[in-house]
Amino acid sequence: AVANDEIVILLLGRPYHSDPGLNHEVLDEFQSLGFKTLSMRASPKDEVYLMQYFKEDVDFDYVESPYDIRDVWAENFSTNSAQKVWAAKFAARHPNVAVLDLSSFKCGHDAPTYAIIDKILGASRTPHLTLHDIDANKPGGSIKIRVKTFAYTLEQYQKRLTDQKRTTYNTIQEEMRV
């Protein structure tokens, strides 16, 4: 993603949200628009790799390791909900990762994470689409509209990333010439 200036969409959800029938084919919609999607269970786990994104937090003792979420959620009881919070923290630190946050059936275990995840992603300005209660009514048409709107947002975000990279490169080149 970084090498190609691509945006990857990280799915925050329960294991069943990877099922097209349960996620109303929302991942397929994004893939048909050219976006790669990644389940939070497939996100990087290598500590050396993760330290480039969590080094300051560890150095300042906000957390003990890149996997620690106690700085934002001290008492967590659900493994899956804790994984969602950690994945949001990772996405907030990686400029090429956007988030799709799904929940179904007013999931009680995930309810405590809604505000935490929203705060993490909002503070970092990480592009994110939240589809809570995805099974409410018959969301097919409204989901397609939201997917296309979010895809446009991601395209604009990707352009800004590319422009920033180009500006940084040009600045370095100019400084080397002086």
Show the residue positions of the predicted features:
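An N-terminal assembly and electron-transfer interface module characteristic of large anaerobic redox
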Residues: 1-178
